[in-house]
């Protein structure tokens, strides 16, 4: 069956933090009198991700509502404050770091994204976004000029469903007007972007921009333009 639609994850698939989380945290802390080397902040990012995955494994449903999305970032930035000795104005630094990433000016677009989206559109493929993200994703994609490529954008917090729940992918299929066998999903996470769409009967590609290790049975690409080989 021919692919009529392609849906995309966002983080580490289409976008990356720019400036980085560490750079943004350092800049936020500087506003309150802290002079923290970027290298020091960067050395604690792995601990922040470890905290994220601990929370995700415990109950990833924080992605289903605004307060949960906000909380998962707040606790990571609070950990950065703790590790970097930010005591006074800790809440202000956490909030400033969080707010910086609510708009597009703090996100970069991978070099292979726009060309790939245009090529898919030229082939008549309908495009969509399915992402575990708060509703600010709508503003971010609009700020970056990417919204125009997508027929539908579904942040998890907007609909109360999160990947890898097949119900979220089924909702996207309904809104895009295609059957599962006509839709390909592309993202970077094995469970959210591999197992989830496959459980919904869709096709899946995992994009690996960081030379990771993936579960057997998943199809992995290393450049977004390779999506064109599967359409």
Predicted regions and their residues:
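N-terminal helical cap/lid subdomain that shapes the substrate entry/recognition surface
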Residues: 2-111, 123
């Amino acid at each position: 069956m021919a692919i009529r639609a392609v849906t995309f994850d966002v983080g580490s698939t289409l976008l990356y933090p720019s400036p980085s989380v560490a750079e943004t945290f350092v800049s936020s802390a500087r506003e309150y009198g802290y002079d923290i080397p970027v290298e020091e902040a960067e050395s604690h990012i792995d601990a922040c991700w470890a905290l994220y995955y601990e929370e995700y494994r415990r109950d990833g449903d924080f992605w289903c509502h605004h307060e949960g999305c906000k909380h998962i970032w707040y606790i990571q930035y609070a950990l950065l404050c703790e590790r970097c000795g930010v005591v006074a104005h800790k809440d202000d630094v956490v909030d400033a770091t969080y707010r910086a990433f609510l708009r597009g000016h703090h996100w970069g677009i991978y070099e292979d994204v726009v060309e790939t989206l245009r090529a898919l559109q030229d082939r008549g493929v309908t495009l969509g976004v399915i992402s575990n993200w708060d509703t600010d994703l709508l503003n971010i994609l609009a700020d970056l000029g990417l919204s125009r490529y997508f027929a539908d954008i579904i942040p998890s917090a907007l609909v109360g469903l999160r990947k890898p729940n097949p119900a979220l992918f089924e909702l996207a299929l309904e809104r895009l007007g295609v059957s599962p066998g006509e839709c390909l999903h592309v993202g970077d996470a094995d469970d959210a972007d591999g197992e989830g769409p496959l459980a919904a009967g869709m096709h899946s590609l995992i994009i690996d921009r960081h030379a990771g290790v993936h579960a057997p049975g998943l199809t992995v690409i290393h450049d977004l333009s390779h999506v064109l080989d599967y359409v």
